[in-house]
């Protein structure tokens, strides 16, 4: 048990909380009514038992850091200890954020949780408490870019994954948007704001430290932690792989549909956004920005040039000295195995549901639609090359695939290429199974993989459609591969064809579908064309 020595007195006091409470291990207790209890470094919490066999201990809303109210733009502090057991049965508040809008296919995942600057909470699903078993720990980082989201989505419920693989699942909240990624170091000499550009990532580091320090108590192995995430969560995974502060806190990494851009977001780019936020808020100092009411702060973010959307980690020379896969980056994660991939039609979600006219484009309309995604590349050359590579594609197909490559696949490929030169292996996948929702027009869109990785099809029906033999098959294939990777650093299972590590010679890629297959360099003509003509991709 690696608890802070300063908290020994708190832990001792908690042992005498109730005469009807009995010890069930060094740091966990089980009280009357079979209610699981967990002793943390700061005090005890009580949870629930869930899962198909009622054998998963669940703790929601465990505080891993103190409230940031009154300490905006500053590093997270340890929580104040408590003496009486606190219930951990409800999710903690989310970070204040702009409304995410109504996305019908995400309806099943909605979970109404309030927002507050007191938002540094995590959630745990585990089959054992202080039982001496060294279970792999899987720490999920939520999507939403760096601006929205939380660890409380119904799609992230860890019960089935914990039960299926006997792993520990952890999800968490951290600071987002201007609260977690406003680079203010150039606008104030006060050292307490020196890390303001990367606070969200440093919050995650603090949560990982909590996991390390409580691994025994939650039935896990501090030496076998996998960080995994989708979309913005995958970008956070990539960021952590370049942070010295995170070294040793995880041993494997999975990046789903959101590898970090390989181009740096520097103080030169970040400082003008912070200045614009201050001007929009009507304040002249960082201190005033830190003190203004949170509702006014969020309103100012939404009106500013960033629109509360353009925030990301900053290469500040402190917590992030280089982008993780830049040629001159410090290879702090060279020994970390990586699983990385995308969905085949990512942009049919963002580029389709929000703009339904894109499902019926003409060839005449296509050049103007593609221009925002290709920067200075020759649109005509891209269209001609795509039509040659995919003779059966219509104009909408070309639009969605180029946009998908630009925003997702290219960065995943570049990350895998550079990772393959390091000591630890990298494995590449692509999800091809098509959802029937929206009349099938979404095909294999962004975030569809979440339902299968968590084995949560029943919680994802608005996105996957009804439970069928196919959806069960997809959950079996993907959840078991992710569990295998978390356990051993290798995603191969008996149900999959042999899955080699990725290299630039073969480019072996697992195609996840009802009949999975390994394909070397899938859609090679498309890849060669677009990697030659497009920049390396966008950061989420």
Regions found by a protein language model. Give the residues of each.
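C-terminal motif of bacterial Sec signal peptides marking the signal peptidase cleavage site
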Residues: 17-19
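Substrate-access "cap/lid" subdomains that shape
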Residues: 108, 206, 213, 247, ...
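Alpha/beta-hydrolase active-site loop
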Residues: 119, 193-216, 272
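Active-site loop->helix "elbow" adjoining a glycine-rich segment at hydrolase catalytic centers
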Residues: 143, 199-203, 231-234
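Alpha/beta-hydrolase fold nucleophile elbow
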Residues: 218-230
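Catalytic nucleophile serine of serine hydrolases
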Residues: 229-232, 244, 257
């Amino acid at each position: 048990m690696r608890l802070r020595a300063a908290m020994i007195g708190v832990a001792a006091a908690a042992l005498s909380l109730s005469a009807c409470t009995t010890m069930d291990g060094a740091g966990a207790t089980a009280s009357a009514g079979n209610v699981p209890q967990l002793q943390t470094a700061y005090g005890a919490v009580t949870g629930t038992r869930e899962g198909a066999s009622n054998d998963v201990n669940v703790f929601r809303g465990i505080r891993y850091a103190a409230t940031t109210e009154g300490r905006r733009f500053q590093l997270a502090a340890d929580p104040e200890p408590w003496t009486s057991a606190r219930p951990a049965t409800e999710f903690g508040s989310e970070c204040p954020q702009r409304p995410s809008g109504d996305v019908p296919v995400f309806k099943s995942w909605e979970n109404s949780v309030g927002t507050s600057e007191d938002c540094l909470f995590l959630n745990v699903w585990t089959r054992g408490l202080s039982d001496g078993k060294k279970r792999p720990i899987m720490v999920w980082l939520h999507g939403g870019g760096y601006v929205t989201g939380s660890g409380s989505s119904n799609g992230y419920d860890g019960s089935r994954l914990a039960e299926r693989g006997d792993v520990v699942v952890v999800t968490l909240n951290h600071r987002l948007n201007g609260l977690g990624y406003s680079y203010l170091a150039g606008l104030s000499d006060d050292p307490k704001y020196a890390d303001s550009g990367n606070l969200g990532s440093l919050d995650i580091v603090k949560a990982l430290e909590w996991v390390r320090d409580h691994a025994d108590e939650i039935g896990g192995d501090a030496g076998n932690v996998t960080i995994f995430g989708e979309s913005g969560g995958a970008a956070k995974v990539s960021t952590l792989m370049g942070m010295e502060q995170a070294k040793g806190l995880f041993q494997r990494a999975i990046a789903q549909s959101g590898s970090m851009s390989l181009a740096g977001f520097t103080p030169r780019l970040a400082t003008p956004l912070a200045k614009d936020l201050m001007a929009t808020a009507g304040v002249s100092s960082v201190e005033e920005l830190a003190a203004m009411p949170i509702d006014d702060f969020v309103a100012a973010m939404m009106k500013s040039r960033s629109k509360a959307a353009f925030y990301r980690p900053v290469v500040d020379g402190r917590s992030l000295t280089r982008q993780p896969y830049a040629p001159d980056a410090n290879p702090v994660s060279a020994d970390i195995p990586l699983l990385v991939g995308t969905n085949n039609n990512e942009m049919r979600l963002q580029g389709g549901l929000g703009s339904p006219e894109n499902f019926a484009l003409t060839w005449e309309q296509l050049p103007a639609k593609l221009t925002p995604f290709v920067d200075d590349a020759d649109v005509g050359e891209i269209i001609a090359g795509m039509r040659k590579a995919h003779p059966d594609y219509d104009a909408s197909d070309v639009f969605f695939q180029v946009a998908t490559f630009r925003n997702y696949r290219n960065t995943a490929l570049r990350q895998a290429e550079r990772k393959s030169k390091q000591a630890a292996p990298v494995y590449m996948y692509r999800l091809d199974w098509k959802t029937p929702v929206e009349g099938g027009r979404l095909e294999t869109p962004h975030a569809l993989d979440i339902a299968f990785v968590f084995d949560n099809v029943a919680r994802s029906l608005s996105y996957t459609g009804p439970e069928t033999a196919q959806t069960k098959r997809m959950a079996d294939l993907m959840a078991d591969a992710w569990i295998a990777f978390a356990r051993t650093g290798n995603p191969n299972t008996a149900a999959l064809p042999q899955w080699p590590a990725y290299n630039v010679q073969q480019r072996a890629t697992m195609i996840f579908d009802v009949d999975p297959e390994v394909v070397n360099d899938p859609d090679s003509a498309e890849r060669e064309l677009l990697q030659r003509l497009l920049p390396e991709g966008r950061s989420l």
